[in-house]
Amino acid sequence: MIKVKNIPKRNRRLCGKKLRRQKREDKISHIKAAFCFLLLCINTATLSVFLIFAGIIKIILPIQSLKLLLTRFIIKVGELWIDINNLWIQFILKPRWTVEGFEEMDKKSWYLSLSNHQSWADIFIVQMITNRKVPMLKFFMKFVLIYVPVIGICWWALDMPFLKRYTKDQLERNPSLRGKDFASMKKSFKKYSLYPISVFSFTEGTRFTEQKHKDQNSPFNNLLKPKEGGLAAAISTMPRLDKI
């Protein structure tokens, strides 16, 4: 026969308080998340009008100097979008971090930026710490993302490099696809010779999870295996590269 001792009343009260506090904190977290998402949607919906309109006009205009002028305007709108996001991130989420190394960086150089990938918040974080310190980041994106409503067209207006990735099976069935991802990258990078940029790559190619780490048998403790092919292609196709 198993005997269960009664929990003292004082301990029961403490457990009850902890449980109620945890429920209250969870509720606040959910409210914060919903409010942050609402602010992000409002910010994106408002500024996307300017991005999409300027992007369409840039395609139509035949004069290169006017195209470059519109490109600079689009970048300014993109930086404003990040600034507004940074305001609510700082006020609501209150992140704390230490950032070093920007002393030797500027907005007039061409950069290739690399990072590991931990969560969906990584993009907001790198934008927050780099905005207006280096040229606006250009993220490698899968081509299918251009079809995301509103956001996809905004990314297109911001000259993000959209790449078509092919699986080994696709390449085996259709060998003519070999090298097309490299060609599309080279085409995207041509326009980057006109103004300074920071091309950004999550070199792991995907977010880190313990399962992915195990499946890859990665030699690194906290990283997935880097995808060297995309990195090598970026270095070889960038019209100019000052720093990595």
Spans of features found by a protein language model:
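N-terminal acidic, proline/glycine-rich, low-complexity intrinsically disordered segments
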Residues: M1-K5
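Membrane-anchoring hydrophobic helices of lipid-metabolizing enzymes
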Residues: K9-N11, C15-Y111, H117, I125
